Structure formats: structure tokens, C-alpha cells
Amino acid sequence: MTWQQRIERALDERQQTDAFRRRLPVSHGAGRWLEREGERWLNFSSNDYLGLSQHAGIIAAWQQGAERYGVGSGGSGHVSGYSEAHRALEEELADWLGYPRALLFISGFAANQALVAALAEKEDRIVADRLSHASLLEAASLSPAQLRRFAHNDPQQLAQLLAKPLDGLQLVVTEGIFSMDGDSAPLADIQAAARSAGALLLVDDAHGIGAIGDEGRGSCHTQAVRPELLVVTFGKAFGVSGAAVLCSESMADYLLQFARHLIYSTAMPPAQAVALSAALRVIRSDEGQQRRETLAARIRQFRAGMGDVSLGLTDSVSAIQPLIVGDNARALSLACRLREAGCWATAIRPPTVPVGSARLRLTLTAAHQAEDINRLLEALHGHGE
């Protein structure tokens, strides 16, 4: 078999199972509306949970940062790319979340991969929730450590796996709010199991940070849990992009020595760090609380409006409201019909989700108005969902 034959076979398999992914260029993809080729739809696919990507103050902060620092960092943070703006943001994040240190990364994917790659050795074991993000599971499977997956949100099975004999150390991996199901992890029980076994706990709270909790502190703060490694990302509630790892002083120093994704990547633009500091100020403010309350109201409105036809909904009270339809072709068809009704929703299919669980991943935001949710509900009811 040649490389071209292998590539064509893989593409054919995706085509035959209605799992082929395509990107559609848009003129505006965040906020209340999605705009493309002169048309617009109510946007139920964006992760811009608080609507901050369109916030005038945050946009102005990025512009001011670019005027001061330029549009790029110029290098790795280990060389010349670590600016005063980066340091200020790290200190603000650490203060907000109650950790000694924060380290910035260019993406949540990079942060998760960096942690696993820097920590895991051959004699170690990584025990991960089976529905953890692809960045975590891929890093774990590629690491020299053994990978064991526990049943989704099952602390009892986690404890059983942690109790098995091992020469090395253990790392427990989970998410605060799961990206495809929208449900929350029982973090207190997971932390108890990890601590009982002497394991480190890594929580990726990409979809909780900023969107829930006091001052938007996220899933861990809400559940009174303090993992040794907390990953927060800035492409959701913050409305920007990038990520940070919250940890101890010694762990931060260790990662600065051994986290290759951090050492060998160009640092995020300083202007982006300025914008993120502005976003954090909004998140912590009364305005941020009002936006979280608006988001919570839209979630309640949607779930109440689904009523008796909510059997396909997962048990989610987050901004992520997946409607599981099972078949790939049906998910694509339903997404198409919703767009015809003026609502943009994305069909999520295997391998992103398990076979037989294709779904519409509906995301609600503080930018939505009550009438927008009503329109979505009417479209879903009109198509028998």
C-alpha cells in the first residue's frame, strides 16, 4: 500500500459513514449571530459562553496592547517572548483562583499535552475518565506510562483502578464540565479517590471557568476542590484564546524546565495577554455575574421548553446542551433543517463521540435573547425533536 492509497482509504471510510468533516468559512462566527455568504443564523454552535468575544472593552484592550507591544511576542517565553503583560496576567489568574503560580500556554490542547508529556514516566499510570478531551487521552496514550480509563464519572471504578499494584506514580485526569455531554464531574469524590491513592489530580475546566461559580471561578471552586493541576482555557467564557495551568511553585518551576510545548512554542502575543486581563476583570465584576445569570436563565428556559421531548438531551445544566440522535446521517439532516429554520447548529459525529451517539451540540450563551431560545425550541419541536 502506498501513502496515497492509505490516505484515500481513510477518506473513503469517513465518507461512507457520514463522518467526513468539512470547514465552512464564515464572516462572523462568534456571538449571537453566525454570518456566512450574506446570510445569518442564530448561532448555537459557539463556545463564547458570556459573549465576551464582542465586548468593546476587551477589543479596545487588545488594540491598546498591540499599539504598545506590537502584534507578536517575537519568541518563546524562555528567550524573549515573556512580557510584562504575560507576567501580570499570570499573577492575576493565580490570585483569582488561589494558586501560587499560573503558567500561560498557547492553547488548552497544548497545555494538556504538555502536562502529561512532562510528568508521565514508564513505570507510572494515568487513570483518565473515558470521556476526557482528546488532548488528554492522546497525550496519555502516547506517553510511556500505562493508560487506564475509568467509566464516565465513576469514582468507585477510579478507586479500584488506583488500588492496583504499581511501581511508579499515578495521575488522575478528568474534566470539570465535559465538552461533548455537558455534564459535570463529581470532583469531590474523584479528588478523595486520588488523594487516598497518593495520586496527582489534573482537572481540565475549559467549559466551567468563567461561566459558573463565584466570580466565575469554575467547577473546582464551586465543588470546593483544589486539584494539583488546574487547566483553564480562554477560548470559551473568556472569549479569546489560549490557556493557563494553575499549580504549586515547585510544579511551575518543573514545567518551565520540562514542558516542551511551553519551552519550544512562541509565546502568545502580549496584546492577547492584555485582552485576557481585561476579560478577567469583566468576568470578576458585577457585569460578569449578570452575564452568568443571563446564561443560566437561557439554559433553564431551553431545558424547560424541551419538555416531554427531551429524551435525547444529556443530564446537563451547563451551556452545552447536546441532543443525541444516534445516527450520523440523521444528525446531519437535523442540523440542515435547523439551518433552514434560521438556527445554526453543528452535528458532532464519531470519532469525536462514540459510535451510535451522533448529536447536535447546542451551545447557549449570554448573548442569546429569550426570543432566540424560543425560536430554537420551535424549530426542534417542528422537526419532532
UniProtKB/Swiss-Prot annotation:
Pathway: Cofactor biosynthesis; biotin biosynthesis. Substrate binds at R21, H133, T352. Its cofactor is pyridoxal 5'-phosphate. Keywords: Biotin biosynthesis, Pyridoxal phosphate, Transferase. GO terms for biological process: biotin biosynthetic process. Gene3D superfamilies: Aspartate Aminotransferase, domain 1, Type I PLP-dependent aspartate aminotransferase-like (Major domain). The modification N6-(pyridoxal phosphate)lysine is found at K236. Its EC number is 2.3.1.47. GO terms for molecular function: 8-amino-7-oxononanoate synthase activity; pyridoxal phosphate binding. It catalyses: 6-carboxyhexanoyl-[ACP] + L-alanine + H(+) = (8S)-8-amino-7-oxononanoate + holo-[ACP] + CO2. Pyridoxal 5'-phosphate binds at G108, F109, S179, H207, T233. Homodimer. Belongs to the class-II pyridoxal-phosphate-dependent aminotransferase family. BioF subfamily. NCBIfam families: bioF. Catalyzes the decarboxylative condensation of pimeloyl-[acyl-carrier protein] and L-alanine to produce 8-amino-7-oxononanoate (AON), [acyl-carrier protein], and carbon dioxide. This is 8-amino-7-oxononanoate synthase. It comes from Klebsiella pneumoniae (strain 342).
